[in-house]
């Protein structure tokens, strides 16, 4: 079996305005579509940056996932974005009021990294 690439990553958010602002206005993704689905009580929109597509479901009644700092639950741990300069990203996060952890060094590859969080507390990572 051959997989060519990751097609998309699906995320569930609870608040349309906050989630859209975070991914589109703050992180710079382009919104490519939007579907209001009353029968499922949600809104689905896709955002894209380069080859990365995030499929975002807004479900106001979805239960919240366990909070950090304990990410050790079964399932997706976090989503990591490769960046050229983690420190510059952290400065931008401060300017944009994006909650993040401190700069640290990856134990395995020795590169700079840091975790940050979307409006619902989903752990995300930037990594050089």
Which residues does each PLM region occupy?
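N-terminal beta-strand motif that seeds the catalytic metal site of vicinal oxygen chelate
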Residues: 1-18, 76-81
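A short, acidic/glycine-rich surface segment
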Residues: 32-34, 40-42, 62-67, 102
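Vicinal oxygen chelate
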Residues: 1-2, 46, 90-128
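Core segments of cupin and vicinal oxygen chelate
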Residues: 11-53
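Exposed loop/turn and edge beta-strand positions of beta-sandwich/beta-sheet ligand-binding modules
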Residues: 5, 41-43, 75, 110
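Mid-chain, well-packed structural core segment of small domains
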Residues: 69-86
């Amino acid at each position: 079996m051959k997989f060519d690439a990751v097609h998309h990553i699906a995320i569930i958010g609870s608040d349309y305005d906050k989630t859209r602002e975070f991914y589109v206005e703050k992180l710079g993704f382009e919104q490519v579509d939007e579907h209001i689905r009353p029968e499922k009580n949600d809104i689905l929109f896709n955002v894209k940056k380069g080859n990365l597509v995030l499929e975002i479901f807004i479900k106001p009644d979805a239960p919240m996932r366990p909070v950090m700092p304990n990410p050790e639950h079964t399932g997706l741990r976090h989503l990591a974005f490769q960046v050229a300069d983690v420190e510059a990203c952290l400065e931008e996060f401060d300017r944009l009021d994006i909650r993040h952890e401190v700069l640290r060094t990856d134990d395995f590859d020795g590169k700079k990294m840091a975790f940050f969080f979307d409006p619902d507390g989903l752990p995300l990572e930037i990594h050089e």
